[in-house]
Amino acid sequence: IIESVGEGVTDVAPGDHVLPVFTGECKECAHCKSAESNMCDLLRINTDRGVMIGDGKSRFSINGKPIYHFVGTSTFSEYTVMHVGCVAKINPQAPLDKVCVLSCGISTGLGASINVAKPPKGSTVAVFGLGAVGLAAAEGARIAGASRIIGVDLNPSRFEEARKFGCTEFVNPKDHNKPVQEVLAEMTNGGVDRSVECTGNINAMIQAFECVHDGWGVAVLVGVPHKDAEFKTHPMNFLNERTLKGTFFGNYKPRTDLPNVVELYMKKELEVEKFITHSVPFAEINKAFDLMA
């Protein structure tokens, strides 16, 4: 909830309900003016900045020593100071303890399916990695109308939970003596229509691309790989009209689009509650990290 605003801020006011976002939307740069991009020149994620853009200084300190901002949001605190371009004003009726999860990973996976993969109704989608982002990608495929959603994960204990998010079938690569892209091709008469990769493992990224059907298949990469990783595939995979795409924050523009994602929840089209397994008081934040391990 906005407590106060700085000079010149007109888009939000004290009392407004907002979602803080690690990336932003200045609404002035070429990316913000493009209907295709959310990679704001001014406010895109910068993990090294640690200060406010306007004056290059931190707004936090302890015993006179500065504490630097964390990914532009510093939300591991009860009060924070942010650039107005990194807060999305939302419906004040939306429960903040639920829709807060839309500030990062859930929107990333959801948008990867809905905005980037864009599976046609009745299509088949493979989701690689069934962590929170992957489950959100499955949820996005469900909302889009995919009829088969195949979860791919090395941890079979995740499969039952993934059914709640629309997954209809599962593949554990360890159960097969052939590449998983071949397994998926055999299951789907030549390949899936769409795939969404949510692990960041370079081998899974390649598999996610090579498992899509020639002629119309689209693979979307969400996971962040190791900085030295190299994506290698045969050029014929492209010449046979497979498409490879990347995405950042589900292609959502934070200020423009997140209010609409919240409305999906308010209209009961997006089921946020099933992403939440525990609630802990702020004083036990480290316990929350332990629960995610």
UniProtKB/Swiss-Prot annotation:
E.C. number(s) listed in UniProt: 1.1.1.1
Needed cofactors: Zn(2+)
GO terms classed as biological process: formaldehyde catabolic process
Cofactor note: Binds 2 Zn(2+) ions per subunit.
GO molecular function, one term: S-(hydroxymethyl)glutathione dehydrogenase [NAD(P)+] activity
InterPro entries, sorted: ADH-like_C (IPR013149), ADH-like_N (IPR013154), GroES-like_sf (IPR011032), NAD(P)-bd_dom_sf (IPR036291)
Pfam families: ADH_N, ADH_zinc_N
Compartments, record wording: Cytoplasm
Reaction catalyzed: a primary alcohol + NAD(+) = an aldehyde + NADH + H(+); a secondary alcohol + NAD(+) = a ketone + NADH + H(+)
Binding site for Zn(2+) 2: C26, C29, C32, C40
A GO CC term assigned to this protein in UniProt: cytosol
Keywords: Cytoplasm, Metal-binding, NAD, Oxidoreductase, Zinc
Residues where Zn(2+) 1 binds: C104
Main location per the UniProt record: cytoplasm
UniProt superkingdom: Eukaryota
Keyword 4Fe-4S among record annotations: no
Residues the record lists as binding NAD(+): G129, L130, G131, A132, V133, G134, D153, R158, T199, V222, G223, V224, F249
Assembly behavior: Homodimer.
Annotated family: Belongs to the zinc-containing alcohol dehydrogenase family.
Full protein name: Alcohol dehydrogenase 1
